[in-house]
Amino acid sequence: MKAARFIQMATVISLATLGGAATASAQSKTFTISWWGYNGEKMNANIIEPFKKICDCNIVFETGNNADRLNKLKLRDGKGVDVIYLSDSFSQQGIEQGMFKEIDQSKIPNLKEIYELGRAPQGKYGPAYTIGRVGLVYDSAKVNPPITSWNDLWRPDLKSAVSLPGITTTAGPMAVIQAGKHAGVDPYADTEKTFKAVEALKSNVVKNYNTGSELVNLISTGEVRVAMAQDFTLASMQAAVKTMTWAKLKEGDIATVNTINISKGSENVDLAYKFIDFILSKDVQQKEAEQGVDAPINTKVQLTPDQAKIWTYGAEQVGSLSLISYSKMNAAKTEWIDQWNEVFGK
């Protein structure tokens, strides 16, 4: 899952800009995909060129970060693109804004091949096409005993050793959720006790990070020995410090997914269903995983241990993940941001 790491200039680009593909000729339809804009050559080879043979259509892209693309779709009242790739928190916003069509799962045969948590992660709307996780990483050479629980973040021996994601990042609000669980309360219902737990954690926190590269720098300089992180940062952290280890938490990690939805103003709904079905297929998912693009959500994908080590992969690992309610989290986020800043702004 790499969406959060790549922010491209928001623009509509033709297929010709992706890997030098030939200019579309006399196709009768134009199929528009809203997408981040990274790994263009691989997407062209693995998805676009093969799908063109199915759709006999011209394919164009609107690229940019989650917020920009969703805002453009909202300003156009759901028109202008056929399908839109988004991270789960932003697709929840799109659902609440009425930007997407409800999904008829019978039109996506490959849904039966993906992990159950990805089939309808946000109710009646689009499926997940890749999966990741948020958990804890630690330097096994410096942290003893090992990290085995979310509650270990509050351990006295980890004073000035921890880094948390900033509250406005993808994983930041999940730190608040874990603080509520540590306090034994529902973080949505009892913010007072939840943020007392956040306050109690403050002495262990060296710095809150806002980007993966910032976290890697904190790890490489030795300032941080434990961090809450998304799994896509692990390889970079291990390149900096070989002993950085993904913790096996008794409560499990938190699932993150990227979704694909059909915009409510799509002019090519049948093609949109075919496209979604295509990217969920075993063949496409296998190539994307092997080439380091996205973690597979299709259960039939087979990876070697070396290929799998960078991904959230396999029934056991996926089965241990917990999903969060983005509708609740998005509703609480404004208050959480204010209270978080009160704690860490002191």
How would you describe each model-predicted region?
Residues 89-93, 220-221, 225-243:
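A ligand-binding cleft/hinge motif common to bilobed small-molecule-binding domains
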Residues 20-26:
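Sec/Tat signal peptide C-region and signal peptidase I cleavage site
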Residues 135-142, 178-181, 257-269, 287-288:
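A bilobed periplasmic-binding-protein/Venus flytrap-type ligand-binding module shared by bacterial periplasmic
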Residues 38-44, 80-81, 85-223:
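Extracytoplasmic ligand-binding site segments that recognize negatively charged/polar headgroups
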Residues 263-321:
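Mature extracytoplasmic/periplasmic domains
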Residues 132, 196-201, 209, 240-264:
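Periplasmic-binding protein-like
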